[in-house]
């Protein structure tokens, strides 16, 4: 036989060190005719088969006892479809040869992936069930440009890296292979000889499903069908919509009482979804559900960005949960972590033996606070991986919004770093220009492709224009968490009321910058961990005063301009900090009616009242929607303002942050007439003292605070009241 393969090539193939298997394996034209070569470890006999007739065309010669076979097909000149009949351990198996198939990735896809402009890279990369030339199987593609060899290993080939080495597309650095017979539900990984000659096993960055920790294999499963955005869901995200978010960690919202094990996605659909709906929330926000190895990271150190965690069920179970939320009228927000990833060896870290996804210099690529690695946003393929992921969750799962975690750590090169521990940008500044461009590009693409979905930024500095359009120099987010408001108001509320008069500005300062961004007011998971205490436990005084303070604070928060966010457990005033390894303290709501029931009823009424009255949400980001009536009564710690809708209808909000009732408290108003109390956090319904105004109160033509008409109210102790003007 001519064109005999060099012994060194055979040795390299068998040892798994040969980078170009398609140049040797499969069908080739040689001077002797059509030659078929195959690497089939442990096989004893191999024939080339005519598929239509089952006729044996030629027996391949075993050139190496370790499994290398070769043979010339007599009387054939042109390539044709064939199969291999392989005898393993005395049993014959009919297989299709993976090395008879041509390149998989189309030239346009390869070009877009290399340019980093492929809108949906997950439709090409990863594992996809496919049929090629009438043969069913799975096509695998992975970006690893510096690897010396990459193989697919899995349940279909005994996890043997010799059996399925891949083809390198040099123009893109992508390795590809179609494996006949590999099917949905099978586990796989990529085995590679990395740039340094080390053998590595890597999970698929684009895996759509993965094993539950501590196992780390990827799972073949098809792309989920696209989810249509409904007009109702789009409207629920808009600036003038009532948005009240229930933030949830699925692993600890509620657990099975007999074994402390998690509820499944489907059980959560049956329990969490109706509860959130009954409580009057409009949105569910889920702490990250991308696959992650460490429970204690709460999902914020993901290794499988395209795979919903298997802790609570399958990918389809997660889709069922989202569908249930939508059916209940709830939009779903997913916490998304494009800022960093963990150092676990099976995942993205040094993926092909080089710093492929991360920066090579630890001053740029290592986050010392979290022992994680920082994405290299300036690398086109990395940015494309992340932008595509954002679109994937919205298009393929029906996620309505993404809340982007730790934006400040992305956009500042010196974030949490001392002098000398960071590298300035090309202009000598501290901004991470590549990260800023990545965020702008992500928000632009989402706005173009899925216009009803929105993004929210957790950004802890005063970086300008986070929620402003890109053409105005902004980052292009729709909303930004108002962490300054949260810190100021909690600092105020934890004070003994006798000292609050000296810190009055902590409640008023937020309005000085309120219209610089589109704010969400967050009482998030970060405020009930790491020794900060629960929200309830931060309130001063005895038990009665703690609950009264909390109710007054919630009444203030729900009335203040901005969308609302409350972490689970806070809606019924859980007394201890959040523990991700245990259920919420639902036992607090067992037995007779108590203060916890009162807070729960209040939050429900706040949500329902807030949603019903447009004045409370329609003009959150328009100065016309808010006006102070009493802003300077710091001696009595009283604050009064109005919220206003587009038609000029007003709601008066009055807060008394001392335990002293204020009788006959007079203040000027804009609209004379009869005002009805629609919410009172001191109501007996919420286990308050039930002080108030007997339902309605009429204005007087008595000048006050620079206005011709005024109201005289009873302001209950440690309470917030809302009043609406009734038609004459």
Swiss-Prot record:
Pfam families: Alpha-amylase, Alpha-amylase_C, CBM_48, GlgB_N. Belongs to the glycosyl hydrolase 13 family. GlgB subfamily. It is an enzyme of class 2 (transferase). Transmembrane segments: none annotated. Catalyzes the formation of the alpha-1,6-glucosidic linkages in glycogen by scission of a 1,4-alpha-linked oligosaccharide from growing alpha-1,4-glucan chains and the subsequent attachment of the oligosaccharide to the alpha-1,6 position. GO terms for biological process: glycogen biosynthetic process. The active site is at residues 405, 458. This is 1,4-alpha-glucan branching enzyme GlgB. It catalyses: Transfers a segment of a (1->4)-alpha-D-glucan chain to a primary hydroxy group in a similar glucan chain.
């Amino acid at each position: 036989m001519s064109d005999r393969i060099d012994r060194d090539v055979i040795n390299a193939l068998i040892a798994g060190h040969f980078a170009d298997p398609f140049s040797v394996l499969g069908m080739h034209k040689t001077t002797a005719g059509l030659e078929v070569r195959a690497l089939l470890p442990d096989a004893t006999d191999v024939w080339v088969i005519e598929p239509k007739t089952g006729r044996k065309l030629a027996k391949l010669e075993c050139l190496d006892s370790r499994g290398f076979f070769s043979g010339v097909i007599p009387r054939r000149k042109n390539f044709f479809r064939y199969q291999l009949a392989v005898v393993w351990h005395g049993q014959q198996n009919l297989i299709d040869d993976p090395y008879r198939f041509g390149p998989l990735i189309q030239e346009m896809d390869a070009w877009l992936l290399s340019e980093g402009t492929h809108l949906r890279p997950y439709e090409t990369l990863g594992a996809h069930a496919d049929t090629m030339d009438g043969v069913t199987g799975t096509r695998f593609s992975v970006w690893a440009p510096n690897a010396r060899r990459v193989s697919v290993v899995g349940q279909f080939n005994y996890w043997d890296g010799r059996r399925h080495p891949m083809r390198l597309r040099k123009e893109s650095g992508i390795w590809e292979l179609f494996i006949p017979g590999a099917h949905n539900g099978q586990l796989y990984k990529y085995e590679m000889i990395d740039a340094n000659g080390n053998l590595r096993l890597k999970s698929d960055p684009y895996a759509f499903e993965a094993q539950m920790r501590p196992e780390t294999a990827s799972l073949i499963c098809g792309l989920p069908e696209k989810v249509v955005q409904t007009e109702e869901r789009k409207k629920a995200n808009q600036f003038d919509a009532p948005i009240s978010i229930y933030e949830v960690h699925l692993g600890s919202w509620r657990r099975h009482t007999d074994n402390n094990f998690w509820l499944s996605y489907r059980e959560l659909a049956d329990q969490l979804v109706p509860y959130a709906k009954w409580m009057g929330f409009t949105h569910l926000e889920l702490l990250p559900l991308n696959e992650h190895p460490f429970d204690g990271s709460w999902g914020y150190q993901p290794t499988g960005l395209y795979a919903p965690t298997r802790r609570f069920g399958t990918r389809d179970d997660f889709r069922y949960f989202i569908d249930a939320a939508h059916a209940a009228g709830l939009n779903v927000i997913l916490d998304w972590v494009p800022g960093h990833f963990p150092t676990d060896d099976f995942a993205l870290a040094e993926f092909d033996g080089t710093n492929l996804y991360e920066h090579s210099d630890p001053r740029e690529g290592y986050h010392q606070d979290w022992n994680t690695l920082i994405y290299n946003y300036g690398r086109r393929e990395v940015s494309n991986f992340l932008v595509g992921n954002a679109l994937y969750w919205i298009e393929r799962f029906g996620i309505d919004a993404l809340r982007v975690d730790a934006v400040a750590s992305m956009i500042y090169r010196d974030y949490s770093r001392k002098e000398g521990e960071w590298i300035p940008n090309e202009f000598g500044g501290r901004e991470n220009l590549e990260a800023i461009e990545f965020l702008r590009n992500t928000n632009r693409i989402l706005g173009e492709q899925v216009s009803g979905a929105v993004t929210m930024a957790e950004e802890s500095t005063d970086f300008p224009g986070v929620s402003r359009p890109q053409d105005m120099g902004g980052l292009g987010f729709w909303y930004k968490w108002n962490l300054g408001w949260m810190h100021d108001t909690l600092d105020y509320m934890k004070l003994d009321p006798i000292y609050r008069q000296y810190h009055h500005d902590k409640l008023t300062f937020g309005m000085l910058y309120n219209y610089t961004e589109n704010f969400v007011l967050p009482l998030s998971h970060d405020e009930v961990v790491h020794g900060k205490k629960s929200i309830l436990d931060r309130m001063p005084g005895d038990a009665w005063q703690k609950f009264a303070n909390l109710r007054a604070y919630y009444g203030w928060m729900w009335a203040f301009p901005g969308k609302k966010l409350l972490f689970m457990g806070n809606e019924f005033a859980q007394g201890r900090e959040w523990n991700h390894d245990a259920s919420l303290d639902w036992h607090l709501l067992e037995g007779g009616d108590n203060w916890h029931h009162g807070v729960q009823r209040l939050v429900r009424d706040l949500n329902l009242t807030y949603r019903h009255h447009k004045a409370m949400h329609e003009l959150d980001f328009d100065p016309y929607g808010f006006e102070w009536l009493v802003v300077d009564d710091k001696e009595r710690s009283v604050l009064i303002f109005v919220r206003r809708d587009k038609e000029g209808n007003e709601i008066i909000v009055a807060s008394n942050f001392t335990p002293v009732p204020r009788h006959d408290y007079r203040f000027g108003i804009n609209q004379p007439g009869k005002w009805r109390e629609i919410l009172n956090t001191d109501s007996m319904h919420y286990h308050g003292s039930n002080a108030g105004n007997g339902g309605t109160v009429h204005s007087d033509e008595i000048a006050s605070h620079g206005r011709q008409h005024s109201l005289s109210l009873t302001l209950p102790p440690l309470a917030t009241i809302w009043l609406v003007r009734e038609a004459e």
